[in-house]
Amino acid sequence: GKYLKERNPEIKVIGIDSVGSVYKKYFETGIFDKNEIKPYMTEGIGEDIIPGTIEFDYIDYIVQVDDKVSALETRSLAKDEGLFVGWSCGAAVAGAKKYIEENRLNDNDVMVIVLPDSGTRYIGKVYNDEWMKEQGFLD
């Protein structure tokens, strides 16, 4: 985000966070609230600490998505788009869709979604029907 905003301050950086992580509330209020910390399963996003590497000054908005929505979106990307991506990618796309629902975009807006990982580490989880059923993600 920093690199892009330094080149074009008009760019909006949208962060994706897991429900149960502290990022969204901290971003919105500046308060680290331990009551926000809840178990979540999506790997690669969210946290129960505020690491020194995250620069909130370059983030414009944070969207939270839950594990089920992220997992189902991950599977949808593979089935419908042919993209064998990881769970955090499903979260990124689900978060982008949620952002679009909550914010008006115009015809000139361009959205770029970073898909940070491959699906190879999730064959036994998100891409496994039995595991998905055990988590209550497949009805």
Residue ranges and their predicted role:
Residues 1-8, 100:
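Surface-exposed amphipathic alpha-helices with a cationic face
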Residues 6-87, 104, 126-139:
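Active-site/ligand-binding loops adjacent to catalytic centers
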Residues 15-17, 112-116:
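Short beta-strand segments
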Residues 74, 92-99:
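Buried hydrophobic packing segments
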Residues 87-89, 115:
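A short, small-residue-rich loop immediately preceding and capping a beta-strand
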Residues 108-110:
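Nucleotide donor/acceptor-binding cores
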